[in-house]
Amino acid sequence: MKPDIIKKRRPLPSDDEDEYNEEDEMYEDDNNNYEEDEDDDDDDDEDDEDDDENEEELIKQQLSNVSFSSLLKYKKNGPTDKLNLNTITKNLQQQKSFKKEEQQEKEEMNSKNKYKIKRESSDAPVEMTAMKPVSRFRQVVVNKTKMNVRDPRFDSLSGGKYNEDLYRKRYGFLDDVIKRDVERMESTWKQMDDCRERDQLYKKIQSKKSQLKTQQLKDQKRETKNKLWSNEIESVKKGKTPYHISNKTVKQFELQEKFKQLKASNKLDKFMETKRKRISSKEKTFLPQRRSFDQDEN
């Protein structure tokens, strides 16, 4: 507590009045100086309070960035001063920056090592970690020379579009190869004893024969079409009106060619009989097994 300043003058004798005046003036000057010092102290206290408030706000902002677990650790170790909080925040920021840098480095290393293949030599198999699951479809040894398979029907070198005439001219020898295979399979089939193996081989022989037969029919159709087209072109050259060849005309022309071949081989009569039987079996009307109800009453 500050001492109360007494401003009243004491009554003194007249002899000592001059001395008192001097002492009183000195006392008043000291009093004024003391009041000025008191005002300055009050201003300093207010400034200190403002600084403390600013420091508290800064501490609160720093504490908002600090994790709860780290605060508990520092609470156990000692009081949370301003220096401690600054060091905490700096350490946390450094840790975050280090973590980000490590993650970026790991991602870069993974992206680089993703396509790297470890091998002792170019012909050796690929070394892979046992920690990762291996896919079923993988290439263990890379082929140096890649085989490019070409289909002549769709290859750009052979015209792009499928030309059946050209294909049959170039690869017609395959029919002879299939015929030789059928003859060889038939000879082995005759010598086999196991019934199951004989049946399997017999099915293969029949499939090869049917393949040859279908190919022959295709060749015949193509030849008939080519003949019709050639005849039509000659007729147009002579001055006749062009005529569109339909599938019906192609079938009629095929039948005529077939009859000519059968007549030449003396098989026409047999063919006609089988055809007649087939038509008659279709046209037959089957009698009902049970009589109608009206006939039973009569």
Curated annotation (Swiss-Prot):
Lineage top rank: taxon: Eukaryota
Record's keyword annotation contains DNA repair: no
Compositionally biased residues, Polar residues: 61-70, 83-92
Comp. bias intervals (Acidic residues): 14-56
Cellular compartments annotated: Nucleus, Nucleolus
GO annotation, biological process: maturation of SSU-rRNA from tricistronic rRNA transcript (SSU-rRNA, 5.8S rRNA, LSU-rRNA)
Family designation: Belongs to the RRP36 family.
Protein name, entry field: Ribosomal RNA processing protein 36 homolog
Organism: Dictyostelium discoideum
